[in-house]
């Protein structure tokens, strides 16, 4: 039977005018992320970007990520302004550990019903993250998909491309017994372990906005944006011989540190070298989470672990401190003995 009423895309739940309004809202913040290598602006079918001329043998490094169920917590608390920083951080931090300078970033924003204010807040956060990491936000996709997401719920994904000199790629191959390990402090749980965090909140019937921890709400602790280490690490890499860098994300200490270690080496972590930030003690105690599970799920206050020669430790910590990072020696590299794990926390 033919429908007598003329139907439009908007009747089906897709508002093209709202999408256009969003593009106009974000043009200004996107422009602030521009790099000289970027050709053209928003609106093209594809983004064009030249390689920086300073590289002799440039190798492109790419990465993609999301922010997991931290997004659900942000939506529940109606705090959308920093989730974009998280998105950029998760991508660019994975690039810089290989010595790569982030060049450009693209985002994907999908929702059941587009709320222009919410989307603009998220994308403004993405632009801020791009500025913090020195990369250009060159484009993205906003998908309004009624029936795929509940109401104004949304999901985000990020895609980043960086560049590194071929001879300066950091791949862990130089790591050897006797190397020192330096930690860089995290700003909070970053963007990992939030399904467990939300489970702990639910089981303990905790309101994160009404619960205070060290003069800040639990919500502030949990939604603190993921730290972006790009500029401080790129500066360090220029001045110090870095053997490996591990970004502590999903899988925590047990799974991320071995990703950059040769098979015959072991990372020995000195647990007494730092104190867990209060949020991790709260999570462990409230959720009755085992120590092993904490180190597997969370960063426990450590965002990056750097392997380098022991003679370079003092200089590296001085440089990182001057760059605004909190850094300390967290352990050493030893020869792996048969039957032992590649990471030991003692």
Curated annotation (Swiss-Prot):
It comes from Photorhabdus laumondii subsp. laumondii (strain DSM 15139 / CIP 105565 / TT01) (Photorhabdus luminescens subsp. laumondii). The gene is purM. SUPFAM superfamilies: PurM C-terminal domain-like, PurM N-terminal domain-like. This is Phosphoribosylformylglycinamidine cyclo-ligase. Pathway: Purine metabolism; IMP biosynthesis via de novo pathway; 5-amino-1-(5-phospho-D-ribosyl)imidazole from N(2)-formyl-N(1)-(5-phospho-D-ribosyl)glycinamide: step 2/2. Belongs to the AIR synthase family. One of its GO terms (molecular function) is ATP binding. It catalyses: 2-formamido-N(1)-(5-O-phospho-beta-D-ribosyl)acetamidine + ATP = 5-amino-1-(5-phospho-beta-D-ribosyl)imidazole + ADP + phosphate + H(+). Keywords: ATP-binding, Cytoplasm, Ligase, Nucleotide-binding, Purine biosynthesis. It is found in: Cytoplasm. The keyword Iron does not apply. Its EC number is 6.3.3.1. GO terms for cellular component: cytosol. InterPro entries: PurM-like_C_dom, PurM-like_C_sf, PurM-like_N, PurM-like_N_sf, PurM_cligase. Its main location: cytoplasm. One of its GO terms (biological process) is adenine biosynthetic process.
């Amino acid at each position: 039977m033919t429908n007598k009423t003329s139907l439009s895309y908007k009747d089906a739940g897709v508002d093209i005018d709202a999408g256009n309004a969003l593009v106009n809202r974000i043009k200004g913040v996107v422009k602030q992320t521009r790099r000289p290598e970027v050709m053209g602006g928003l609106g093209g079918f594809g983004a064009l970007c030249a390689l920086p001329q300073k590289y002799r043998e440039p190798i492109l490094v790419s990465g993609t990520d999301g922010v997991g169920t931290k997004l659900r917590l942000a939506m529940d608390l109606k705090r959308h302004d920093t989730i974009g920083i998280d998105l950029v951080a998760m991508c660019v931090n994975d690039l810089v550990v290989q010595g790569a300078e982030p060049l450009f970033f693209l985002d994907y924003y999908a929702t059941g019903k587009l709320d222009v204010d919410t989307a603009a807040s998220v994308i403004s956060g993405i632009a801020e993250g791009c500025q913090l990491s020195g990369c250009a936000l060159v484009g993205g996709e906003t998908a309004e998909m009624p029936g795929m997401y509940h109401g104004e719920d949304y999901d985000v994904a990020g895609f980043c491309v960086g560049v590194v000199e071929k001879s300066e790629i950091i791949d862990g191959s130089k790591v050897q017994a006797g190397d020192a390990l330096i930690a860089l402090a995290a700003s909070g749980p970053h963007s990992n372990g939030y399904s467990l965090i939300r489970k702990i909140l639910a089981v303990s019937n905790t309101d994160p906005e009404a619960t205070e921890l060290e003069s800040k709400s639990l919500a502030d602790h949990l939604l603190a944006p993921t730290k972006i280490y790009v500029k401080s690490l790129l500066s360090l890499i220029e001045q110090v011989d870095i053997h490996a860098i591990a970004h502590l994300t999903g899988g925590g200490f047990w799974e991320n540190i071995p990703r950059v270690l040769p098979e015959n080496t072991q990372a020995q972590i000195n647990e007494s070298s730092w104190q867990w930030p209060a949020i991790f003690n709260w999570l462990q105690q409230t959720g009755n989470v085992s120590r092993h599970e904490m180190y597997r799920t969370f960063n426990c206050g450590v965002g990056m672990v750097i392997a380098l020669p022991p003679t370079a430790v003092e200089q590296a910590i001085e440089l990182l401190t001057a760059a605004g990072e909190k850094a300390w020696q967290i352990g050493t590299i030893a020869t792996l003995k048969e039957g032992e794990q590649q990471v030991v926390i003692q």
